[in-house]
Amino acid sequence: MKLHNNKENFIEVIQIVSRSLNISPSLIEKDYYVTMILKSINDEVSGLIFKGGTSLSKCHKAINRFSEDIDLTLDSEHLTEGQRKIVKPAIIKTCKNLGLTINNIEETRSRRDYNCYQISYPLLFKNDEVNPVIKVEVVFIQECYPDEIKKADSIIGEWLKANGFSKQAENYDLFSFDIHVQTIERTLIDKVFALCDYMISNNLQKHSRHIYDIYQLLKKVELNNEFNLLVNRVREDRKYNSLCVSAQDGADIPSLLKRVIETECYKKDYETNTIMMLYAPCSYEEAITGLKVIVESGMFQENDEYKKIRYIYLFQFLRKLKVIKNIEYLKCHQKAIITNILIKFKTVLLA
């Protein structure tokens, strides 16, 4: 039996946990449904990877804020057309079993690289700051790596176990569960690029949360050579998405971050929206210091290692096309090779 099916018990438990943790009951209620949806989809879909802000709080325990969206993708092994078609039916089945409604089901398509399912739940605790809709975003545009297995839990489930109510947690299916989740290192990198992209497009509203997340993640992530290599690899992958402007050739991440700091373009949104979602206070002035650390670290500066990775990616691509066999040849004849490929593609397109 699910806890929300017993309305009186559900309300009582939420109120008790709310008083104990000093967290708004509406946030606890929404977190419960986020967790139940995530658990059910994870049970239905092989190769599922959980990523984004909610994974940071729910699995990594790296941030102390409420995150309401579920970001999902598939690992490279399961990223096939057949497996992608399984995701939508799994979400539909999940919502049916939990008694929830997908508001925009007719707008979603299994073949798309991106779908956002907007799921409504029966609201018991009203709060103007909390939207009673859970977004499940399924993205197949970029490969998700690296990942690891972590435990996921709801606020209610975690509280019940910590306070000697394990039996009740078991009865209501509120035990934690294993799920593949993107590492915090990769998520930190994605958030730095995303923060720059949103600034470039002047899409600032509700994106200042990335500043808070970056600040908190820096407490757990070691900025070393391995991290720098991952930055370069992610930059090269993001480059193939035209919306990822900050990953394109010539974009200077440190300069973009300095602009964010100097213009304070995210400050108003941070103090209006992000700060309302925090379980523990963290001022804008404190959070923005994380960007200064990133700038001074040099981790996002284009360097010789990044140039090597670009050569390797290009070499692998050209080798698949059976154009070259030796990377040294690539270094010496890169311009001529690319020109030759463009001529061949043009010939094919005009044929």
What are these language model-derived features?
Residues M1-L48, K58-N64, D75-I324:
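Structured mid-to-C-terminal alpha-helical surface segments
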Residues F50-T54:
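Glycine-rich beta-strand-to-loop/alpha-helix junction loops that act as flexible
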Residues S110, Y329-L330, T339:
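Short, often N-terminal, low-complexity regions
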Residues L314-L318, L330-Q334, L342:
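Short hydrophobic targeting helices and cationic amphipathic motifs
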Residues V323, E328, A336, V348-A351:
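Acidic, Ala/Val/Gly-enriched low-complexity intrinsically disordered segments
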